[in-house]
Amino acid sequence: ECQDPHVIFNIHGGNNLIAPNASQAEQKVEAKPADELKNKIRNNQERRPMDLQVQRFSDIDLNDPFFDSLRASYPEFNEWYNKKAAAGATAYCYYVDNELKDFLYLKIEEEELSDLIPVLPAKKRLKVGTFKVDNEDRHTTRGERFMKKIMDKAIAEDVDEIYVTMFPTEELRKLVTMFEKFGFSHIADKKHEDGSSEYVLVKDMRTQVNDLMFDYPFVRKAGSRKYVLSINPEYHTKLFPDSILKTEQKYDLIQDVSETNSIYKIYICWMRGVKELKKGDKLIIYRTNDYKGSAAYRSVCTSVCTVCEVKTITDFADEDAFVKYTNRYSVFGEEELRGWYKNKDYFTVIKMVYNIAFTKKVINKVMKERVGLNPRYWGFFRLTDVQFDKLLELGEINERYIVD
């Protein structure tokens, strides 16, 4: 088995590669009749324009040009890949118009990491193996979406740590920075026979430092206020793709845009009271009625977010500053944003972190009957700690996400 991860993060059209013993050798596998049949079946399967899915290695075409950079950097890549395929390994795959764009392989380990300096003792860890994100468009943030998948997997498996190894090259600085932003620290090194050395970046999943991003995705309840924030259906799914309702047409609604893929979200609204939000406040996202049925069953709580910052029009020097701040992570287009800046002087801009999707959506009827909620205004209202906890319970949130 390959002991080193292959991590590629193609940022803004550049090719940033992490892999041991870089070589320019290309090793495409020779197609066999069985492979050809499998590929034909795979290619004939209907896949929507934007598709994030879990696939077996054996169901992915190893001859896909997507893997050429990995073959070029790691001569044994095909051998490693075939071993994973034979073992039934799976990976997160992201397709755009039927073309493989992103690939994430994660692995659970429990042994001592004896090949590192210093040696890391045996613990249950999630290893980030292959991480390749092809960001050809400067405005996409699919790397953040994979980061959320890494965190969610770590929570689901109840690991002690997450780790990834990478070479500390200038080209990889942005990738290192992204991991560090989410609480990974350089605590060890991995030496190679050719004299090269990789950073070992580790995130401790058992310790929080009361920092919004370092502690991500954990939700710290103590010392924070809790609210319900309503969002209309046409905006909700674009902002929170993991919180999609079964009745919504996922692939018709979700596009490859930064607000869909990012951990950060920006929402602009005119609801009374929201400008009083502060950093660290917790938000239960409430998808309002789509008018395809009674609000009692169609309006639902779907997600938990944490407020990063709140701004009003007076916080922006000019229109361009407003558009620059909001355009990347909001669901609104530039023309729409500019129009609002010119015509509205009382909107509120909420920047938040997307922590958790509810496992079970909590409908309006249950909110009333089980939580005792019946505010005069459903757009935005405050929760007691007891009500917040009850919504998390009804939403079947994994308790590992919650820090008291």
Task: Identify what each model region corresponds to.
Residues 97-130:
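Conserved acyl-donor/pantetheine-binding loop and adjacent beta-alpha core of acyl/acetyltransferases
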Residues 36-46, 153, 159-160, 164, ...:
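Contiguous surface segments at macromolecular interaction interfaces
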Residues 2-40:
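Long, low-complexity intrinsically disordered regions enriched in small/polar
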